Amino acid sequence: EEQKLLKTSTKEFLESKSPLSALRILRDNGFETYDKDLWTEMVEMGWTALIIPEKYNGLNFGYVGLGQVLEEMGRKLTVSPILSSVLMSSTLISLSKNESLKTKLFQEIMNGSKLISVAHEEGNYHNPEISKTTLKKDNDGFILSGEKKFVLDGSVSNYFIVSAIDDSNKNISICLVDAKAVGIKHNHKVHMDSRTYSDITFDLSLIHISEPTR
């Protein structure tokens, strides 16, 4: 019953706040990445908390609940960071063993104060098991080196969750990087559907935020 109510409220909200014409306005206004006022309302609706566990003050509606929202957003071609910052990033953050970091990031995602993008793809073909980006231990941090492509909403994100080969065990790890860290170069682009993405180069960026998740 709660899932049905969520779907109904989402449909009504988007019909009122995000008609198909909204995408055209963003597209024709210098490729604006998303409507910030609309995003604020989505946060207030609780959509950013849908898949976050109650332990972290989330709504714990699961992927079925979030799927209801994404389905309706797809019908209206609604542009927002919910795919990158909520679906993709929250899922990977949940894998971390660092509870204090998880609590902090989940809170920032839920209140909309921070946006997070996943940086994983390295070429034109999706191959999640292959990465040329490397992560090496260096004193009190890590050295990250490599290039990522097609980073969704990379131009507006505060953090990147980056996949890399851990030099110590050759396994794929994920780590959190401040988007403004020294040694990161951004090349922002626009998809044919007017959505923005970035190609990002990490050149000896020192990570102090947390141990990588393996």
Model segments located where?
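A short core secondary-structure module
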Residues: 119, 147-185
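Short glycine/proline-enriched turns and hinge-like loops at secondary-structure junctions
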Residues: 61, 127-130, 153-157
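Flexible, small-/acidic-enriched active-site or ligand-binding loops
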Residues: 130-132, 150-151, 178-206
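Amphipathic, small/basic residue-rich leader segments at the start of a protein or domain
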Residues: 1-83, 104
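Residue-level detector of conserved catalytic or cofactor/ligand-binding positions
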Residues: 205-213
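A generic, well-ordered mixed alpha/beta core segment in the N-terminal half of proteins
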Residues: 97-113
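N-terminal glycine-rich flavin-associated loop
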Residues: 78-100
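A short, Trp-centered hydrophobic/proline-enriched beta-strand micro-motif
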Residues: 112-123
